[in-house]
Amino acid sequence: MKAKITLAKEFKIGEIDKRIYGSFIEHLGRAVYGGIYEPDHPTADEDGFRGDVIDLVKKLNVPIVRYPGGNFVSGYNWEDGVGPVEKRPKRLDLAWGTTEPNYFGTNEFMKWCKKANTECMMAVNLGTRGADEARNLVEYTNHKSGSAWSDLRKKHGYDEPWDVKLWCLGNEMDGAWQMGAKTATEYGRVALEASKMMKWTDPTIETVLCGSSSVNSKTFGRWEIGRAHV
């Protein structure tokens, strides 16, 4: 076997963003319940987080974790997962055909990330919801005080904002399996407006768009081109 090596001094090797090596946690199977959160487990701490899982995540040195999904996020009402656990509603999860008890939500995830020494990446629902709900979540997590959503966070027992910097705008929105699936143009419009309003709420954040979910998709390639014209 012969190999050819081409050296070109004009090309520079860029620094790889460590976030590429991140992971995500979704309300799917035993990922959350029975995975990272299991109050009755022998290693569970005062928050119900499994200590053995946290130790393993620390060993992996995971730089960032996305939450709450995944397909799950496209039908998720983030408000269901904050406040007193006993008052949180149970919802049908159409993504995975289960019932979501909402024992574990936004604030629990933030606390888990701190214990696991990893950064939070939040995903917002752009399937069944939109820009207003997305910017409200940014206000809840990142605004210090003096507004309805930030004061609600404080009422829930979290005086300081979580200061989440990276936000994912939906999940696999080109897929027919996704709740609220969209064309590239439809997604581009809602993503643009959501990102704009989220950054008006907190100018320090970054937002991440959805690309094609699969090379086997009929819109692969055209999805990115169509979105670029928005």
Question: Could you say what each language-model-derived stretch is?
Answer:
Residues 1-226:
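Non-catalytic accessory regions flanking glycosidase/transglycosidase catalytic cores in CAZymes
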Residues 228-230:
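Conserved small/polar residues in nucleotide/adenosyl-binding loops
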